[in-house]
């Protein structure tokens, strides 16, 4: 036997790779703790917490037509934006082999919907076009990326039967799109749920969606009305599969157009050129004073960009690790193999509430309880994303519960959790965690609108002061940071080989 073959080093095991990834996440979070602004202020939350609990247990809303209108406008923004973004994303996905298209899609999806809303508000005021574009633009980039990855996963054999002279568009029409159609439609339904959450939180910047009334109720201390709004939104998310069916789209789309709110304030699309050519550039640049421009950029970077960027990244890393902890603790509550029939449905309901409630709303609640620091943001991000990933992991566990892999002598309870279910689910759990890393970073940045010292705080302040040059640079820095994290996440997934077999089909199980 050839000794050189025997001398070859053994490839690293899956357990070793996963252990290394977990160690990296743990070290990054621990190193972030001393520098992150997560101090607990001296507050007495128990009285406020009891009032919130009473509001959730006894929801009340006197103006039912206003509640229905708010829900309808939330759905209208989400539905119309997805109806436009999905075909646009599909078109870009067919051109995704071009570097310029990939860069464009990465840049538009790296900016949060609320930041897009603040930008378009300067052009179109508090009108329907602002809300639609705020969701449509980043969602188009997301659809393009995901649809392109779905196409890459399709088997190549059907395409080989076509004539070599057939153009690329026909190849997509005759092979790739029909092959990928179930995954494309399933992911589109999943993005619609995400669009509902995005539409709701657009109310935090003044649009008349659910978030506007929710923020007002919380600020006024009317927790019974806030509870009614939260429960209404949870029911809306939970019943999507009943009222959002393909055959009903011809009814919902015209109704959504009719439900859009009227224009409030100005709407000046002709201002776009001045906004792009003048307003977003600092005065020294417009005057050709390059020395003054350098001084302006250095000052802004040292006083706003760097502090905001550091806090955004630190909170992201802590929230990422805590998300993994929440997932590991929560998925057994909804797993048929671990929870049993009595605990499973309450567990699934808990995860439904966590994944349905936007991070912004959870952070707003925690701010009232713990004061203005990064702690509310970390808790909100971990609970929402942990609830979402736990739901996915529990669904994967349920799918295998009656499979041939199960044996009559398999252990139960804690032993099954530790030795069977968690080892089997852990690679997919990490893969979903890395998929959400980019999202957690975007949400960490936007938490600044609530007063937390992330990049969003400085962006919101710049818009309030009508300093569009500062806001533009800060948004660019946010996008660059987001693209960098997305690149690191993608490379880690590939290096550790922890891609789930069918990530997009699995993700859509949140709709079921």
Task: List each model region and its residues.
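N-terminal, non-cleaved signal-anchor transmembrane helix
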Residues: 1-79, 83, 87-91, 95, ...
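Short hydrophobic, aromatic-rich alpha-helical segments embedded in or entering the lipid bilayer
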Residues: 47-54, 206-216, 271, 451-462
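Loop-to-helix entry region at the N-terminal start of transmembrane alpha-helices
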Residues: 69-77, 109-142, 303-319, 355-390
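Hydrophobic positions within alpha-helical transmembrane segments of bacterial inner-membrane proteins
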Residues: 78, 82-90, 94, 114, ...
């Amino acid at each position: 036997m050839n000794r050189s073959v025997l001398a070859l080093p053994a490839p690293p095991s899956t357990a070793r790779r996963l252990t290394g990834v977990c160690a990296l996440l743990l070290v990054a979070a621990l190193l972030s703790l001393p520098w992150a602004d997560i101090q607990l202020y001296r507050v007495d939350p128990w009285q406020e917490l009891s009032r919130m609990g009473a509001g959730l247990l006894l929801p009340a809303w006197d103006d039912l037509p206003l509640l229905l209108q708010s829900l309808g406008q939330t759905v209208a923004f989400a539905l119309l934006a997805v109806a436009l973004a999905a075909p646009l994303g599909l078109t870009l996905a067919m051109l995704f082999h071009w570097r310029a298209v990939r860069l464009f899609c990465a840049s538009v999806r790296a900016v949060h919907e609320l930041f897009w809303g603040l930008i378009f508000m300067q052009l179109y005021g508090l009108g329907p076009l602002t809300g639609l574009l705020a969701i449509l633009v980043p969602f188009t980039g997301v659809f393009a990326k995901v649809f392109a990855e779905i196409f890459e996963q399709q088997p190549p054999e059907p395409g080989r039967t076509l004539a070599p002279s057939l153009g690329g568009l026909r190849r997509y029409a005759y092979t790739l799109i029909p092959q990928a159609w179930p995954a494309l439609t399933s992911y589109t339904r999943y993005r619609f749920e995400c669009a509902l959450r995005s539409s709701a939180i657009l109310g935090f910047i003044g649009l008349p969606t659910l978030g506007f009334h929710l923020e007002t109720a919380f600020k006024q201390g009317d927790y019974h009305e806030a509870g009614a709004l939260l429960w209404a939104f949870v029911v809306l998310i939970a019943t999507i599969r009943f009222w959002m069916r393909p055959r009903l789209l011809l009814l919902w789309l015209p109704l959504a157009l009719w439900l859009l709110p009227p224009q409030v304030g100005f709407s000046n699309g002709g201002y776009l050129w001045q906004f792009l050519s003048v307003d977003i550039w600092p005065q020294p640049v417009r005057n050709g004073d390059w020395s003054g421009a350098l001084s302006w950029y250095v000052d802004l970077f040292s006083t706003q960009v760097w502090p905001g960027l550091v806090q955004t990244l630190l909170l992201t890393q802590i929230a990422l690790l805590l998300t993994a902890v929440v997932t590991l603790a929560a998925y057994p509550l909804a797993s048929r193999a671990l929870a049993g029939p009595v605990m499973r449905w309450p567990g699934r309901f808990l995860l439904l509430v966590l994944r349905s409630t936007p991070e912004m709303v959870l952070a707003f609640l925690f701010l009232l309880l713990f004061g203005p620091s990064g702690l509310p943001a970390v808790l909100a991000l971990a609970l929402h994303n942990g609830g979402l990933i736990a739901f996915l992991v529990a669904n994967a566990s349920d799918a295998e519960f009656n499979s041939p892999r199960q044996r009559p002598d398999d252990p139960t309870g804690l032993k099954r959790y530790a030795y069977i279910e968690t080892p089997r689910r852990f690679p997919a759990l990490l893969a979903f965690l890395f998929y959400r890393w980019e999202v957690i970073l975007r949400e960490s940045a936007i938490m600044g609108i609530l007063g937390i010292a992330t990049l969003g705080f400085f962006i919101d302040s710049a818009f309030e002061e009508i300093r569009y040059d500062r806001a533009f640079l800060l948004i660019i820095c946010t996008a660059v940071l987001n693209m960098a994290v997305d690149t690191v996440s993608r490379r880690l997934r590939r290096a550790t080989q922890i891609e789930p077999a069918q990530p997009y089909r699995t993700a859509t199980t949140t709709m079921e």
